[in-house]
Amino acid sequence: MRKLWAPNWLSAKRHHANQAATRLIGRHALMAWLAAALALSAGAAQAQLNVEISGVGASQIPVATANFQGEAQAPQNLTAIIRSDLARSGRLRNVDPGGATVAESANVDLGSWKSRGADAFVAGSVTPSGNGQYEVRFRLYDTVKGQSLGGLAFNVNQGQLRVTAHKIADYIYEKLLGERGVFATRLSYVSRVGGRYQLLISDSDGQNSQVALTSNEPIISPSWSPDGRRVAYVSFEAKKPVVYVHDLATGKRTLVSNQKGNNSAPSWSPDGQHLAVALSRDGNTQVYQVNADGSGIRRLTRSSAIDTEPQYSPDGKSIYFTSDRGGAPQVYRMPAGGEEAGSAQRVTFKGSYNVSPRISPDGKYLAYITRSGGFKLQLQDLTNGDVTSLTDTSNDEAPSFAANGKYILYATRVGGRSVLAAVSTDGRTRQVLSLQSGDVREPSWGPFMQ
């Protein structure tokens, strides 16, 4: 069997135990375990989020969010979460409300808030409604035009207060910028503490993490279903890589692919009915399609090369994948029906080593990792072929688009530490999430919640 072009990314300590699978997973070089970037669900330090903003200046919209009336009696500080969300957007800027507490029902002097430098103002309230329930209300104002931009009311339990704050931030983002926010979306990643591996799900800011699965063997390649209810991943619990689908609400797992050899790199079709996977059952790793219940397996690529890391296009008509069929790894595109339906076409031409393709939700951009004095996150315009380098780090890996296509989550090293990071697609805003202890890898940004 041919040796895979991707060098070993597992630590030397675990190299021999996972050598066969490592040769076939199709990950780019230096896929090392990342220092923890997100909080564990229990007993761990909370994630620390640092936001670096450059080159935006006056283009940021200034927003003042007053303290919500009654929130001091609630177990979550909603306004703190809202302000944090707005700040990390890179496109909205917080204006200090000076400690003011204002309910959404108040008669607001918008002129006074404009004089403080705010173009938008947010007021709200949190009211206990019995049996652990809370009523959360808010209203958004345009201080420049002197008018209301609407608001919402929520009846939620204690555990839903945090996501409610994210939804309020999403509302503000959309009303002021004209596009959907992603604060209420979720992240998935794999944590390792000692010899224990955990698949975790967290809020988009790295907080409120929950354990979906714990294993004594590695878990890799989490991939969200389009409806955000399931995550596909690869588990080594059978002493080889096997693909499962995990229902996050029930905890039920479905074995999707346990073919001869290695089963890796699952990617959902846009309709949630199928998964593209990389299998070595017939020799070299090739791309296959399988139904989400594990039935109906079908081979899609038919080359003598290594074909791996498949990704469906948002319209479901194409599959992007990594292949060394030209002598070195590059990104290719083929019809979703496979190479029998049409030949694969090379997509990346800048650089001699390009891997880990991810397509933006609108299908217009390709994020990938190039090897050029290190491993760097790139963004390619699929219309004109223009390529932009989004980071100044040299150990980037595992890119994943936010649901609105405006940000990319990835793993890298900063200041000698391994971290998770997110960068806006214009390169102006960077967020770094770090944790004091533990390892984490393979981040994946979830879809809009339905």
UniProtKB/Swiss-Prot annotation:
- Where does the UniProt entry say this protein principally localizes? periplasm
* SUPFAM superfamilies given in the database record: TolB, N-terminal domain, Tricorn protease N-terminal domain
Q: Which GO terms describe its biological process?
A: cell division; protein import
- Alphabetical list of Gene3D superfamilies matching this protein: TolB, C-terminal domain, TolB, N-terminal domain
The UniProt keywords, alphabetically, are: Cell cycle, Cell division, Periplasm, Signal
From the UniProt annotation, give the residues forming the signal peptide: 1-47
Q: Which InterPro entries match?
A: 6-blade_b-propeller_TolB-like (IPR011042), PD40 (IPR011659), Tol-Pal_TolB (IPR014167), TolB_N (IPR007195)
User: What Pfam families does this protein's entry cite?
Assistant: PD40 (PF07676), TolB_N (PF04052)
Q: Which GO terms describe its cellular component?
A: periplasmic space
Q: List locations, semicolon-separated.
A: Periplasm
Sequence similarity = Belongs to the TolB family.
Its annotated function is as follows: Part of the Tol-Pal system, which plays a role in outer membrane invagination during cell division and is important for maintaining outer membrane integrity.
| HAMAP family tied to this protein | TolB
Task: Indicate the quaternary assembly.
Answer: The Tol-Pal system is composed of five core proteins: the inner membrane proteins TolA, TolQ and TolR, the periplasmic protein TolB and the outer membrane protein Pal. They form a network linking the inner and outer membranes and the peptidoglycan layer.
> What is the name listed in the Swiss-Prot or TrEMBL entry for this protein?
Tol-Pal system protein TolB
Q: Which organism is it from?
A: Cupriavidus pinatubonensis (strain JMP 134 / LMG 1197) (Cupriavidus necator (strain JMP 134))
